[in-house]
Amino acid sequence: MFSMRIVCLVLSVVGTAWTADSGEGDFLAEGGGVRGPRVVERHQSACKDSDWPFCSDEDWNYKCPSGCRMKGLIDEVNQDFTNRINKLKNSLFEYQKNNKDSHSLTTNIMEILRGDFSSANNRDNTYNRVSEDLRSRIEVLKRKVIEKVQHIQLLQKNVRAQLVDMKRLEVDIDIKIRSCRGSCSRALAREVDLKDYEDQQKQLEQVIAKDLLPSRDRQHLPLIKMKPVPDLVPGNFKSQLQKVPPEWKALTDMPQMRMELERPGGNEITRGGSTSYGTGSETESPRNPSSAGSWNSGSSGPGSTGNRNPGSSGTGGTATWKPGSSGPGSTGSWNSGSSGTGSTGNQNPGSPRPGSTGTWNPGSSERGSAGHWTSESSVSGSTGQWHSESGSFRPDSPGSGNARPNNPDWGTFEEVSGNVSPGTRREYHTEKLVTSKGDKELRTGKEKVTSGSTTTTRRSCSKTVTKTVIGPDGHKEVTKEVVTSEDGSDCPEAMDLGTLSGIGTLDGFRHRHPDEAAFFDTASTGKTFPGFFSPMLGEFVSETESRGSESGIFTNTKESSSHHPGIAEFPSRGKSSSYSKQFTSSTSYNRGDSTFESKSYKMADEAGSEADHEGTHSTKRGHAKSRPVRDCDDVLQTHPSGTQSGIFNIKLPGSSKIFSVYCDQETSLGGWLLIQQRMDGSLNFNRTWQDYKRGFGSLNDEGEGEFWLGNDYLHLLTQRGSVLRVELEDWAGNEAYAEYHFRVGSEAEGYALQVSSYEGTAGDALIEGSVEEGAEYTSHNNMQFSTFDRDADQWEENCAEVYGGGWWYNNCQAANLNGIYYPGGSYDPRNNSPYEIENGVVWVSFRGADYSLRAVRMKIRPLVTQ
């Protein structure tokens, strides 16, 4: 076996050597040596080597690149390009997402801006309307102030003329007395004090010399003008608007406002800042945010020195202007928590009266009425106070007979920034007015009594501590504590009240109107003056609080009374005469059913009737109550909110009851009191006599509802003569009215109806009645009131039972506003059960007897302004 291997090896070596040494043979010569396709054997390791060198041109013939190398290069480049493309795609998706979010956010912002611009535009328009309305009201107030100033100047001239006449009269009397001394057995020793007249004239001239009119710089109010800005975008930027997105173009559609402040009488125009804020942009001037306004009225009253700034009340101060009556002697009530220069309390400027040297509370329509005296500013001839809540009258006049205490302390009032407003007031009461039962003459102070009657003098003083606490909810609690000294031992040096130095002294002259006939009796004898206090004193009450102010209906009910800080109230019970027998604190003044008492006391008049007055603690708390309003015309003239229609409290003449009525102040001249209304048929008007006597139904604050006021009230309201207004409306919306002079009799007279002097568009159905049936049978004039349980008509049967409601029936009707309410208008009487008759809400001369009206109203107002 081994030998065979050796043999094979030898043969192989020999063959190889033979082949290598042999030359070209015939095979190669015949072309057998041509290179042809060969079977390529793949090596497993060929493509595993990734580090192949590049093929150059020189190497291409004998060393070419392999397909594996080419594939590797292609894959590498492809992967690189794929990565780049994916990166670009991711960036594109992220940009699209951000762009979408940005667009959504921009759209939301634009919607918010549109809403804000629209709200700002509405606020600008509202501000423009309110400012114009405020300016017009201020102009009206300025005109009223000028009228009052002119009235004051006229009264001052009259006072001066009367003073001259009185001086001349006293000189004439002195001449006559001197002339009869030679012929008379006994003459009166009398001296004429002309120096006192000269002093009074000088003081009066000083008062007249004061300029009450507003200063020239305040005669013309600035005018605020608001107008839209025409070109919001400057011209050089308009071309760029074409390139902006549509949502941004929407900003140019929002109108912007420009505010300008023009001062009449000058060329100065004050504009606000130049910045606009889209719709309703307003340009404002810098202002003090803590001040609610400023009104420097200058010298606004006789004897007033310095400026009062009631609008700028400072920290914790509030200022409220509540207009009052437009009638004579009443311009409203201004209560300022920060009273201004020279004042330490509330100032209630109103209507100064002739002879007064301060400022009076409004609501004083009577000549010579003193009203509510709270002046503490510098006043020529008088710097005292008169607080009606305590009733203390503290004169400080240099006139004869008056002396100021050595330690005057008329009270202090402090407003703090918190909710607690402490105040302390000391009051000193001096000698009192005392009269004896046998002498009808009232004397004051230490004046000698010429008759045989006895006069006593008493002194008392009191110290009042008032603390006002305002809670976080706005509730205001007033606590008062008064310490009274009956013997006057704790008083400082007291002053004489109204002491007269002799006949002809004019000490009380400034507190009374010279035109009154009882003027001379008042000056010489000291008698109380009826009507000295305004019947409308309590109608103007302003509650000044640190958080605001509010007003209400300032009338007392029968069972309980509404107390208002700073304003005293009359007790509603007790009737007293004008001559008081005994006093324990100060003077009483009476007018009709109303009594003003400065302190709590028991008072007996000459007839022996007594009226008890209430107080707090051991104090003698003052109560003052004005005459309540009688009707809606009175409300219109005196109530702070009387110019607006609504529900008000009134007190009927001749009655002690106070009740609520609805006043229509918008129709015609205003002052209409609603006495009957039908609107929807929700209330049955087929009622008893007692129901119609007392009234029934109800109204809401807007005057909607069905009701009948009551025949008793109609009688009391129409005793002095009234105007009846009947308003009718059919189902098509057509309206008509009828007006009559109107009066309703008493219950003893059957509440008889008296009408005359028809005017209107509805036709005269109450006097002329129905033309077809004749006025004799259908006129309602002079007819008594009838109900189904009390028949007073002219028909043999009961008209009220048949026609469905109480009315002033004849035989039977041409008008019946209390009939059965049929919706729709025209109705067929044959369908009515149980009586087939025209018993709807009818006014024959307007729509016929077979047409039931949709709405009817009956209103009354005084025939003449009372």
UniProtKB/Swiss-Prot annotation:
Residues with PTM 4-hydroxyproline: P565
Entry-listed glycosylation sites: T320, S351, S453, N686
An example molecular function term from Gene Ontology annotations: protein-macromolecule adaptor activity
Tissue-specific expression: Detected in blood plasma (at protein level).
PTM notes: The alpha chain is normally not N-glycosylated, even though glycosylation at Asn-686 was observed when a fragment of the protein was expressed in insect cells. It is well known that heterologous expression of isolated domains can lead to adventitious protein modifications. Besides, glycosylation at Asn-686 is supported by large-scale glycoproteomics studies, but the evidence is still quite tenuous. Most likely, Asn-686 is not glycosylated in the healthy human body, or only with low efficiency.
Amino acids binding Ca(2+): D791, D793, W795, E797
Positions carrying Phosphoserine: S22, S45, S50, S56, S281, S291, S294, S364, S451, S501, S524, S560, S609
Composition bias, Basic and acidic residues: 424-449, 594-617
Any one GO BP annotation for this protein: induction of bacterial agglutination
Region ranges (Disordered): 262-460, 543-638
The Fibrinogen C-terminal domain, residue ranges: 623-864
Annotated site (Cleavage): R35, G36, K100, D101, N121, N122, R123, D124
Crosslinked positions (Isoglutamyl lysine isopeptide (Gln-Lys) (interchain with K-?)): Q347, Q385
Post-translational modification Phosphothreonine, affected residues: T412, T505
InterPro entries associated with the record: FIB_ANG-like, Fibrinogen-like_C, Fibrinogen_a/b/g_C_1, Fibrinogen_a/b/g_C_dom, Fibrinogen_a/b/g_coil_dom, Fibrinogen_aC, Fibrinogen_CS
Isoglutamyl lysine isopeptide (Lys-Gln) (interchain with Q-41 in alpha-2-antiplasmin) crosslink residues: K322
Coiled coil: 68-631
Outcome of mutating R573C: In DYSFIBRIN; fibrinogen Dusart/Paris-5
Pfam families noted in UniProt: Fib_alpha, Fibrinogen_aC, Fibrinogen_C
Isoglutamyl lysine isopeptide (Lys-Gln) (interchain with Q-?) crosslink location in chain: K527, K558, K575, K581, K599
Basic residues: compositionally biased ranges: 618-627
Effect after changing R38N: In Munich-1; requires 2 nucleotide substitutions
Related illness: Congenital afibrinogenemia: Rare autosomal recessive disorder is characterized by bleeding that varies from mild to severe and by complete absence or extremely low levels of plasma and platelet fibrinogen. Amyloidosis, hereditary systemic 2: A form of hereditary systemic amyloidosis, a disorder characterized by amyloid deposition in multiple tissues resulting in a wide clinical spectrum. AMYLD2 is an autosomal dominant form characterized by deposition of amyloid preferentially in the glomeruli of the kidney. It clinically presents with hypertension, proteinuria, and finally azotemia. Involvement of liver and spleen may be seen in advanced cases, but heavy glomerular deposition without significant medium sized vessel involvement is characteristic of the disease.
UniProt note: domains: A long coiled coil structure formed by 3 polypeptide chains connects the central nodule to the C-terminal domains (distal nodules). The long C-terminal ends of the alpha chains fold back, contributing a fourth strand to the coiled coil structure.
Alphabetical list of PANTHER family matching this protein: FIBRINOGEN ALPHA CHAIN (PTHR47221:SF3)
Protein known as: Fibrinogen alpha chain
Source organism of the structure: Homo sapiens (Human)
